Amino acid sequence: SWGGTKTYYRIVAPTTNGYFTSKEPSQAAMNAADSGWKDSMNDYNVMLVTIARAAGENRSYMPGKAGVDPSQNLNQTDPLGLSDDERALIDAAVEAKKANGGKVIVLLNNASATEVQELKDNDGVDAMLEIGLPGGYGFYGVADVLSGAANPSGHLADTYVVTNANAPSAQNYGDNEWTNANSDINMNSELVEAENIYIGYKYYETRYADTVLGQGNASDSVGSSTGKAWNYDDEVTYPFGYGLSYTTFTQMLDELNVDTNQNTVTAKVTVTNTGDVAGKDVVQLYASAPYT
C-alpha cells in the first residue's frame, strides 16, 4: 500500500555532500554588474529568462530542504524549485512586459525535472520551453524553435511535479553511509530503493489508478503536497509525454495487432495535421501491465 515509513539501521541520514546546489545571481549582484540592466528590457518585446540546473556524473540533486546547502545563501527551500533570486528576475521581466507589451518566455536549461507549477500559474509568463542541456550547437535549434523557423514536436520524458521531495524515490534518495562498514571498503554508501519500479511516471500514474479504484490507501495524505487526500491534479504539473506544437493534429488508431508468438504489438495510426503550420507529431502507445 502507499504511504508509511521504514527504518534502516546502521545507515546515517544523508547530507548535501556530493550533490549539486543551484546558484543564480541576486538582484544586487546584477545591479552591481550593470545598474541599467532592467532598463534594457524595455528595448525589446521578448524577454528570455533561463532557469538552469547543472548536471554531471555521480552527482545529482536531493529534493526538498535537505538538499539546500545553508552555507551557499541560495534563497530557496528546494534545489529543484525556484529561488527567490530567480523569482525576482522573472518578476522584473514581467514588469518590463507590461511597459512594452511583449512576451516573457522561460527556458528550462536542465537535466532534472524542476518544479515549475508557479510559472504555469503565473499569467505574466507566456511560455516555457524545456531545452535540456543542448550545448553550443544545440542552441541553434532552440533559436529556430523560438523564432518559428522550426516547429517543436518534443514531449516530456519525465513527469514534472509540484514537489519532487514528496515522491517515494526522493524520500529514499541520499548518500547514506554505513556506520559499521569495514574501513578497507572504498565505497561506503547505500542507496535504498524501497520504491521498487515506482519512480517518475510509474509512481504517479499507478497511484492515480489506485486512487480511482480505491485501493492500496492511494488517497492517503502521505506524499500529498496539500496535506489533504492525495490527488493527481494537485501533484502533477505536466505529465510524462506532454508537449505542444505550433499546429494541431488528430490521431486515429486504425489497427492494433498482438502477436503472442513473437511477443510483439503492432499499431497502425493515421496522423493528420489539422493546422496551418508544417510539423511533426509523436504517436504514444501505453500499456497497463498486470501486478504479477
Task: Name the predicted role of every residue range.
Residues 1-292:
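C-terminal non-catalytic regions of proteins with extracellular/luminal or membrane-system context
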